[in-house]
Design a protein with these regions (language model features):
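General marker for long, soluble alpha-helical cores
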Residues: 1-179
């Protein structure tokens, strides 16, 4: 089967059955790690929403190809860069900075999404990565800062929502104890 056709089929299937798609991608990448970047780029080009799945599969099956693959995805599908950066920061924080820099070089227009993705995936490495990105491209510094700020707002909103759920559960327990 043509690798581009396989990538397109799997990228399309990722929305309906992500677990099966993940297994297929991991098997393909493990069988030929040298083609992982090309395969991931084909997936992202076919469906940018599949970038997170492709990135996770690469980290699991061919981690040495992860930086090259995320850059390749960003180059062909800049809309995929944020999701790829988020997964890299979450699952491979030691490689997050290098991957973000490679993605930024491949798709400078995605700098905000890349920085935001890193901040979403791992807030602990976000400042360091954003600083490296801004130093590499000072003209993108405002976009990079915006990406991190938006991600921080999302992270804070998620923490508030989780706290509200916990508080409601405690109120329900206390109310039940009183009755």
């Amino acid at each position: 089967m043509n690798p581009d056709a396989a990538a397109e089929i799997i990228a399309g299937a990722a929305a309906s059955n992500p677990d099966a798609a993940m297994e297929l991608v991991q098997d393909i990448m493990a069988s030929d790690p040298s083609s992982a970047a090309e395969f991931a780029a084909s997936m992202a080009e076919a469906n940018p929403a599949a970038a997170a799945l492709a990135t996770e599969a690469i980290i699991e099956a061919a981690p040495e190809q992860a930086i090259e693959a995320t850059a390749a995805m960003a180059e062909v599908a800049p809309a995929a860069a944020g999701a790829a950066a988020e997964v890299m920061a979450e699952l491979a924080p030691d490689q997050a900075g290098e991957a973000a820099m490679a993605m930024q070089e491949a798709a400078p227009e995605a700098a905000a999404a890349i920085a935001g993705g890193v901040a979403q995936g791992n807030p602990e490495v976000a400042a360091e990565v954003a600083t490296e990105m801004a130093a590499a491209d000072p003209e993108a510094a405002a976009d990079i800062a915006t990406g991190v700020a938006v991600a921080a707002q999302v992270n804070a909103a998620q923490e508030v929502a989780a706290a509200q759920v916990e508080a409601q559960a405690q109120v329900a327990d206390a109310t039940a104890d009183l009755q």
